[in-house]
Amino acid sequence: MILPQAIKPVVTHLSHQDRLLAFYKWVGIPLRSKATVLLVHGLGEHIGRYTHVAHYLQAAGYAVFGYDNHGHGMSSGEKGSLIADNQLVDDLRFVIEHVRRQTAGPLVLVGHSMGGLIAAEAAVQNKQGIDLLVMSSPALGADTNPVQKLLLFMLPSLLPNVRVDNGVRSQWLARDERVVKEYENDHLVHRKISVRLASWILRTGEKVVREAE
């Protein structure tokens, strides 16, 4: 397979309610694509890090789009914050509708880590508009002890917007040192997570697993 040259995506901002979402459209989208792929990124990163994935999919005949979640990348909001429980899923639904107006044929959601959780919860709530769901290491289970879990259920009502280190370590992401360095030097990457977002990830991960069964 011959991959296209590394061309940066065209980035615009979509206005949704009181927030702006950075929307990515990779150029060279096939006129007659096999399907449309919408990429959803993980905690602390941004969708621009998936350009190599977009180029690979384009070469295989897929149209590719993506966006930065609220509080991530070039989208609005404090880094790692969450306004309301269903906000991230609501944003994804808004982007799906925007993509659907531009394309025809099947829509494939590809979500990594927190993005996999957002995509899975969207599918559990309403499969309409989603033809296929692909998850990479989805955040469906957190390694927490009973005390930590209790705190994450209680603290959002007391200190919802307090932000702490998100615990993501660059050395976990790849064996390729070049990839690790790029991540560490990326000014759009952050290492913050609010109490409300951490609680939502924990609760929603358990909910998705329970309801998917």
Predicted regions and their residues:
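Conserved alpha/beta-hydrolase
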Residues: 49, 54-78
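N-terminal cap/lid segment of alpha/beta-hydrolase-fold proteins
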Residues: 1-28
